[in-house]
Swiss-Prot record:
This is Serine hydroxymethyltransferase. It is an enzyme of class 2 (transferase). GO terms for cellular component: cytosol. One of its GO terms (biological process) is glycine biosynthetic process from serine. Gene3D superfamilies: Aspartate Aminotransferase, domain 1, Type I PLP-dependent aspartate aminotransferase-like (Major domain). It comes from Caulobacter vibrioides (strain ATCC 19089 / CIP 103742 / CB 15). PANTHER family: SERINE HYDROXYMETHYLTRANSFERASE (PTHR11680), SERINE HYDROXYMETHYLTRANSFERASE 1 (PTHR11680:SF35). The gene is glyA.
Length: 429
């Protein structure tokens, strides 16, 4: 039995006192985020308000069900918070209905599959090698095991979506659902064209806007809501909120199916502390300043791509219309894995990534994916990202000449410049 002293420590001790092992490692991770340039396209830096909401006492509350229809008592205030999150999400994207409960973008996608498909049904998504996502039909993913996925790709000559190819495979295979969106496609997607193709065969159109959601909210990328039957997204990445998922639609019949798929179909109790953080992030994204942020993310990405091209580094499709780009390292004779590791030693974090028509194993890859959301959040503009592009070029060109074991001098030089740059743009001080 806990004594009064035990209780006082339980409710009063901070993390540094209660668990030094975890506290120390969080501190080291904070230092990494402060000192390194985050170029992973799916990562961002959230506000203190988002952190406070997610770390709040709402983590104590179980709330199975939906606002006003819970299976537990004591939900008065979490009902209000979840309702605020729903209304803000609807306003942010111009949607009639929203479900803010999915724990992740993957679970949001799974909810749509459960709502609209039966096991064994055919759906059409972008090939993973062309820039799609695991949940769009990879054989390693549930979506590729429970359903019959077919894929479309990009044109070899320009690495842009082959809309004629999409239409051709749709007419031939008659999928029940078509997915537009991906995790490594840098160009603007023609959602109206996808809807036209879906309507021609009586299919649902689902848009996975996880990577572009913040740009869409800020008016810097086309909004799929007027075109899609249903839209899924994460709430982090460019949207700059906590890690989680969101489903949007203008169709009342579809949202009823999705709500049932999320709970009780896939999840039990929602994470109300995360939903509160989502609400805070949606509120931030509704502010006029977020439009400036979204535009700056795209401007920075274009500056980064241009600097890389001038450094002799190849960009898939020749540039970007969004926050991300794929670097094709095959002309340099460098692997994505080696580039990722070398850049990290130079204090620039990215991820190895396959490129269209890549023949390298997925654990090695022939490319890297780069993004500008986190750097833009900490205050970088075009001048800073131009310099970042030049520094990446130095590391990659050094790898091409020196190999991964001989690039230490280049990495050390670049690391000093990175530290000077991040020192000018501090976070969480």
């Amino acid at each position: 039995m806990m004594t009064q002293t035990d209780l006082s420590a339980f409710f009063g001790a901070d993390l540094a006192t209660a668990d030094r092992d975890i506290f120390d490692r969080i501190g080291r991770e904070l230092g990494r985020q402060q000192n390194q340039i985050e170029l992973i396209a799916s990562e961002n830096i959230v506000s203190k308000a988002v952190l406070e909401a997610q770390g709040s006492i709402l983590t104590n509350k179980y709330a199975e069900g939906y606002p006003g229809k819970r299976y537990y008592g004591g939900c008065e205030y979490v009902d209000e918070i979840e309702t605020i999150a729903i209304e803000r999400a609807k306003a942010l994207f111009g949607a009639g209905f929203a479900n803010v409960q999915p724990h992740s973008g993957s679970q949001a996608n799974q909810a749509v599959f459960m709502a609209l498909l039966q096991p064994g049904d055919t759906f059409l998504g972008m090939d993973l090698a062309a820039g799609g996502h695991l949940t769009h039909g990879s054989p390693a993913n549930q979506s590729g095991k429970w359903f019959k996925p077919i894929s479309y790709s990009v044109r070899q000559q320009d690495q842009l979506i082959d809309y004629d190819g999409v239409a051709e495979v749709a007419q031939r295979e008659k999928p029940k659902l078509i997915i537009a969106g991906g995790s490594a496609y840098s160009r603007e997607i023609d959602f109206a064209k996808f809807r036209e193709i879906a309507d021609s065969i009586g299919a649902y159109l689902m848009v996975d806007m996880a990577h572009y959601a913040g740009l869409i909210a800020g008016g810097a990328y086309a909004n799929p809501i007027p075109h899609a039957h249903i839209v899924t997204t994460t709430t982090h990445k460019t949207l700059r909120g906590p890690r989680g998922g969101l489903v949007l639609t203008n169709d009342e019949a579809i949202i009823k199916k999705v709500n049932s798929a999320v709970f009780p179909g896939l999840q039990g109790g929602p994470l109300e502390h995360v939903i509160a953080a989502k609400a805070v992030a949606f509120g931030e994204a509704l502010q006029p300043s977020f439009k400036d942020y979204a535009r700056q993310v795209v401007a920075n990405a274009r500056a980064l791509a241009e600097a890389l091209l001038k450094s002799g580094v190849n960009i898939v499709s020749g540039g970007t219309d969004s926050h991300l780009m794929l670097v094709d390292l095959r002309p340099k004779g460098v692997t994505g894995r080696d580039a990722e590791h070398s850049l990290e030693r130079a204090y620039m974090t990215c991820n190895k990534n396959g490129v269209p028509f890549d023949t390298a194993p997925f654990t090695i890859t022939s490319g890297i994916r780069l993004g500008t959301p986190a750097g833009t959040t900490r205050g970088f503009k075009e001048a800073e990202f131009t310099r970042v592009g030049e520094l990446i070029g130095e590391v990659v060109n050094g790898l091409a000449v020196n190999g991964p074991e001989g690039n230490a001098a280049v990495e050390a030089k670049v690391r000093e410049e990175v530290l000077a740059l991040t020192g000018r743009f501090p976070i969480y001080n």
